[in-house]
């Protein structure tokens, strides 16, 4: 689960991380009132969407008068903000954050993320913070510093100072940087976050350290422990199809291709998508029905997939371990009838009750294309989608 920048800064503030004063706004008038309350003389008008790259996309602007705040708020609020993370369709801006302007002397980058390979938390930092951090990581990876934290021990002062020194933090700000790093780590652990990113972490002309941005992702499996974080959820920022899928315990992510995929198991789903790509196709979605899918669940999965009008063919790829192939077959038949399926459907089933499932499909009277291998299934569905 993601949250907005201003919500992330509320969390950071709770853990003692310095952030600028700011007020969220949901209308132009609220934006002007927020600027008046903050006092100025310089404000930052920030679009609030669940995506990075807002600055380059035109969603973060400086204002030096209340009239300019009004003008910029009118421009940004309601705009379809396109960034490298939103895709070409962009994301509508429904909220703004009006913030005190900052004295920017030097911008750093810092983040915390779980490294599954080492089973530790990685503290990642760079002296090159700001809008071009992705380019820095690509072109000069030596400027990205990584320190692995043992979750049993936690982030030590020595580790935090090592990172501060490695990114060239001046001596008069090192103690502050160490304090901020440790508080960020505490925030990361206590909130069950999967990502905390500050870009930029600013050092002003007086040597003070302050977080000018805040990006959070949270482990959805741990949200039951954090109702206060669930309260931050903004459904307007989420794909309606993904919200609908979650109601039926379906893992669904829409993509840009034209071949719908219905698979049981995340690993098989990714392998299926890779195979479709290998044979020249483009998957329209990731959809994992899980190990305990019912006929109703499969029907709902079809309905969700077909809400995407770009779907030209569907591939159902099932391995019947816990899942029985006859149950999937029943669901496929039911779904085809319920949605009046009008696009080609390729089905591959292997495992428990495989023969019964295939027999049910063959006797259904529906124009279902059968396949025995993943290569055959991918070949047939790619051809059918053309």
Curated annotation (Swiss-Prot):
The keyword ATP-binding applies. Binds 1 Mg(2+) ion per subunit. InterPro entries: ATP-grasp, ATP-grasp_succ-CoA_synth-type, ATP_grasp_subdomain_1, Succ-CoA_synthase_bsu_CS, SUCC_ACL_C, Succ_CoA_ligase-like_bsu, Succinyl-CoA_synth-like. Substrate binds at residues 264, 321-323. It is an enzyme of class 6 (ligase). It catalyses: succinate + ATP + CoA = succinyl-CoA + ADP + phosphate; GTP + succinate + CoA = succinyl-CoA + GDP + phosphate. ATP binds at residues 46, 53-55, 99, 102, 107. The keyword ATP-binding applies. GO terms for cellular component: cytosol; succinate-CoA ligase complex. Its EC number is 6.2.1.5. PROSITE patterns: ATP_GRASP (PS50975), SUCCINYL_COA_LIG_3 (PS01217). Transmembrane segments: none annotated. Pathway: Carbohydrate metabolism; tricarboxylic acid cycle; succinate from succinyl-CoA (ligase route): step 1/1. Its cofactor is Mg(2+). One of its GO terms (biological process) is succinyl-CoA metabolic process. Residues 9-244 form the ATP-grasp domain. Pfam families: ATP-grasp_2, Ligase_CoA. GO terms for molecular function: ATP binding; magnesium ion binding; succinate-CoA ligase (ADP-forming) activity; succinate-CoA ligase (GDP-forming) activity. Belongs to the succinate/malate CoA ligase beta subunit family. Succinyl-CoA synthetase functions in the citric acid cycle (TCA), coupling the hydrolysis of succinyl-CoA to the synthesis of either ATP or GTP and thus represents the only step of substrate-level phosphorylation in the TCA. The beta subunit provides nucleotide specificity of the enzyme and binds the substrate succinate, while the binding sites for coenzyme A and phosphate are found in the alpha subunit. This is Succinate--CoA ligase [ADP-forming] subunit beta. It comes from Bordetella avium (strain 197N). The gene is sucC.
């Amino acid at each position: 689960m993601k949250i907005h920048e201003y919500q992330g800064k509320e969390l950071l503030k709770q853990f003692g991380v310095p952030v600028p004063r700011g007020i969220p706004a949901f209308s132009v008038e609220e934006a002007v009132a927020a600027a008046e309350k903050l006092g100025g003389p310089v404000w930052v008008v920030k679009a609030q969407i669940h995506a990075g790259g807002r600055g380059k996309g035109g969603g973060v602007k400086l204002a030096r008068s209340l009239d300019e705040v009004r003008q910029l708020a009118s421009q940004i609020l309601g705009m379809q903000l396109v960034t490298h993370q939103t895709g070409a369709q962009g994301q509508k801006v429904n909220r703004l954050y009006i913030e005190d302007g900052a004295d920017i002397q030097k911008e750093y980058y810092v983040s915390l993320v779980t490294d599954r390979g080492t089973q530790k938390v990685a503290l990642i930092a760079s002296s090159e913070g700001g809008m071009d951090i992705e380019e820095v990581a690509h072109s000069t990876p030596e400027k990205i510093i990584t320190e692995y934290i043992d979750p049993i021990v936690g982030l030590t002062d020595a580790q935090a100072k090592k990172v501060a020194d490695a990114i060239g933090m001046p001596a008069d700000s090192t103690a502050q940087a160490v304090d901020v790093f440790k508080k960020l780590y505490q925030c990361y652990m206590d909130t069950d976050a999967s990502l905390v990113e500050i870009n930029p972490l600013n050092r002003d002309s007086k040597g003070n350290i302050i977080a000018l941005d805040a990006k959070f992702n949270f482990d959805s499996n741990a949200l039951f422990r954090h109702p206060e974080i669930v309260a931050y959820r903004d459904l307007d920022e989420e794909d309606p199809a993904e919200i609908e899928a979650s109601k039926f315990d379906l893992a669904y992510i829409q993509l840009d291709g034209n071949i719908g995929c219905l698979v049981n198991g995340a690993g098989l789903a990714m392998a299926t998508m890779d195979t479709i790509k290998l044979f020249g196709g483009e998957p329209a979605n990731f959809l994992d029905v899980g190990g305990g899918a019912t006929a109703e669940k499969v029907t709902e999965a079809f309905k969700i997939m077909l809400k995407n009008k770009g779907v030209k063919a569907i591939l159902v790829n099932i391995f019947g371990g816990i899942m029985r192939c006859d149950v999937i077959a029943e669901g496929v038949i039911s779904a085809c009838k319920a949605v009046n399926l009008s696009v080609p459907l390729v089905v591959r089933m292997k495992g428990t009750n495989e023969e019964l499932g295939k027999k049910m499909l063959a006797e259904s009277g529906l124009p279902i294309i059968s396949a025995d291998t993943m290569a055959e299934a991918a070949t047939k569905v790619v051809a059918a989608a053309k």
